[in-house]
């Protein structure tokens, strides 16, 4: 029979190993806790709801959708903390604070923070939108020079041609049409011509049945729809939201496993990049001196400017050109769909709008750029109110480049600061009865417009990082609406849901489309 000393000799190595395992597990748990919660500790002085472990406040987003920030702003005030998984966001929901972040302290917050859907996609990451620091500044200066008023004016005939071609089939008997799809095809065709010098042929009388073109557009649509900001994206994107350190290792593994969403996204982005590179290479060899599309102008700028040559390498040219395709199609189509949906439900607005449009002149008269800017004040109000009602980009991302004070809170370097433009647009202090569609609230002679904070409505962003293509987009929107309302009126389809459901991603989209009944006026 073993003595007590002998038993201790037997158990001692086991206890030592057991203690070592406990120590290791304890250390690992501490490291994990520090990793998961350290970002939020640095901004714990900013008010906000209690975050759930790992997922943060994502369940609130699932519950409230895009309205989650309005709900939290009412509870916590104009500046509050929101946890996107592990990553804390400082949400700015007040117009003056937005001006402070976007303009007054722009040098302290010059870059956009890069969320996990973008960090996994070089094609999106290398565009103007997410490029950073000096490269962004040089890219922006070159691109801005391409958006001169004279160039935009020269695009009116091209835009008008695509618009009339896309709507030719509306002349038949009244029928229901999914306008969100029609507008996406139309805006893709217009920006394809303006950005690439390519006619995709999606919206014409006889759509081009080109396999390469169709494949390119399908890849474009799929790539865009995967930019999710919730837990419905690929596994690597979900991990990027919850545990960012695991995103890239898992993406590298999953993109090699056929059938996974990461594999499909990787394959799609690779094909898109390859197709874009072919377009860029072909256009560079052609060197057409008379071509005025965006890609040709960028290539010319690269050849004439040594600085531009270093900035606009082939991969960045492909990314910027593709970015124009995305920004110039999905967002514009969303706004056009919003206008038709809202106006068709407000006959008093429709009546006044038709009176203004009919008063311009003959239905075949193509408006000039000056006409578009000065002859349609009520149309301007309708567009603004639709953009307020359905803000296509309800959040604008920034990141602190150094320690900075915002709204009385000291934020460390690297803090993600997001401007809640969607909250501003529904704030009753600036927009009384915000849930009502009232275009006259944007009447420059009205009291509401006069007393509103100048940065309460900023649908194209704010400061130097604002959308460079906003004049292009507004010109396209006005031309399209003028042509449509000169010839048709619209009514809600009985098959369409009311209210419309939204998909929440990098930009908003209508989950099930906008379906309307088309009625010819004459």
Swiss-Prot record:
Main location: membrane
Topological relation to the membrane, as annotated: Single-pass membrane protein
Stretches that traverse the bilayer: 14-34
Expression sites by tissue: Expressed in the vascular cylinder (including the pericycle) in roots, the cambial region of vascular bundles in inflorescence stems and the vascular junctions of axillary regions in leaves and flowers.
Localization per record: Membrane
GO cellular-component term (any): membrane
Cofactor: heme
Enzyme class: oxidoreductase
Remaining remarks: The branching phenotypes of the max1, ccd7/max3 and ccd8/max4 mutants can be rescued by exogenous treatment with the synthetic strigolactone analogs GR24 and 4BD. However, the max1 mutant does not respond to carlactone (CL).
Identification of the protein by name: Cytochrome P450 711A1
Organism encoding this protein: Arabidopsis thaliana
Gene assigned in the entry: CYP711A1
